[in-house]
């Protein structure tokens, strides 16, 4: 796991995180509300996640229990079917969840071609990048240093494919952030609306 994921002193986390899991699609059937980490969804009485409603987030879900397997980032909003939270469409399994800490208004990430922060690199500050190739970076991504903010990387351009949550800290190898291959081709910031409630956040039209 990456190091230094603690929230900075004095920086607020998500205020009262809240997510509701429904067994059926379109928010039907038995449901269960979560306000904190859930290592095994089945232990809450929910056999299968058919739809998800995030009332306060963000959250990260995992394919397997105990936060293992493919990752799914949930931000505030409605997810009526499993394919609305996965862009890889590889699995409809959602077995564990935890709130994501958002501890900074600033966002800075450095992506490296080789493990241990070597080789060609690309630095991104306060921006979302839908295609690394369009920015002239065509190398693999084998290690990552997140200096501030919380990010999600994607296997393919356009925020598609497998998702990788990148919290503040160092990831010496792609396996440290859960990637089966050193392939990340787009990245975006995760921004907690509650953090920006004083007007620092301006959604783009």
Swiss-Prot record:
- Residue segments, region C-terminal arm: 193-205
Coiled-coil segments on the chain, per record: none
SUPFAM superfamilies in the cross-refs: gamma-Crystallin-like
Gene3D superfamilies registered for this protein in UniProt: Crystallins (2.60.20.10)
Which InterPro entries has this protein been placed in?
Answer: Beta/Gamma-Crystallin (IPR050252), Beta/gamma_crystallin (IPR001064), G_crystallin-like (IPR011024)
Q: Where is this region: N-terminal arm?
A: 2-16
Q: Which residues carry this modification: N-acetylalanine?
A: 2
Pfam family membership, one: Crystall
**What GO annotations for molecular function exist for this entry?**
identical protein binding; structural constituent of eye lens; structural molecule activity
Alphabetized UniProt keyword annotations: Acetylation, Cataract, Disease variant, Eye lens protein, Repeat, Sensory transduction, Vision
Q: Set out the biological process GO terms recorded for this chain's protein.
A: lens development in camera-type eye; visual perception
Q: Where is this region: Connecting peptide?
A: 102-106
Q: Which domain of life is it from?
A: Eukaryota
Domain spans labelled Beta/gamma crystallin 'Greek key': 17-56, 57-101, 107-148, 149-191
Record's function text: Crystallins are the dominant structural components of the vertebrate eye lens.
Query: How are the domains described in the entry?
Result: Has a two-domain beta-structure, folded into four very similar Greek key motifs.
The entry's linked illness reads:
Cataract 3, multiple types: An opacification of the crystalline lens of the eye that frequently results in visual impairment or blindness. Opacities vary in morphology, are often confined to a portion of the lens, and may be static or progressive. CTRCT3 includes congenital cerulean and sutural cataract with punctate and cerulean opacities, among others. Cerulean cataract is characterized by peripheral bluish and white opacifications organized in concentric layers with occasional central lesions arranged radially.
Quaternary assembly = Homo/heterodimer, or complexes of higher-order. The structure of beta-crystallin oligomers seems to be stabilized through interactions between the N-terminal arms.
Q: Which family does it belong to?
A: Belongs to the beta/gamma-crystallin family.
Protein name as annotated: Beta-crystallin B2
Which species is this record about? Homo sapiens (Human)
The gene is: CRYBB2
């Amino acid at each position: 796991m990456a190091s230094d994921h603690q929230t900075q002193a004095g920086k607020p986390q998500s205020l009262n995180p809240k997510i509701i899991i429904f067994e059926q699609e379109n928010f039907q059937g038995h449901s269960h509300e979560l306000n904190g980490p859930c290592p095994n969804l089945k232990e809450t009485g929910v056999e299968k996640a058919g739809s998800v409603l995030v009332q306060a987030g963000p959250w990260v879900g995992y394919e397997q229990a105990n936060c293992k397997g493919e990752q799914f980032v949930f931000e505030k909003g409605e997810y009526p079917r499993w394919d609305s939270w996965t862009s890889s469409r590889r699995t409809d399994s959602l077995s564990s969840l935890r709130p994501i800490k958002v501890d900074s208004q600033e966002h800075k990430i450095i992506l490296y071609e080789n493990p241990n922060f070597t080789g060609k690199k690309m630095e991104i500050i306060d921006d979302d990048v839908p295609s690394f190739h369009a920015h002239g970076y065509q190398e693999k991504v084998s290690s990552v240093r997140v200096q501030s903010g919380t990010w999600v990387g994607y296997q393919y351009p356009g925020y598609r494919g497998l998702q990788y949550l990148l919290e503040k800290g160092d990831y010496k190898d792609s396996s440290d952030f859960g990637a089966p291959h050193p392939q990340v081709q787009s990245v975006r910031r995760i921004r907690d609306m509650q953090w920006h409630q004083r007007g620092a956040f301006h959604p783009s039209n």
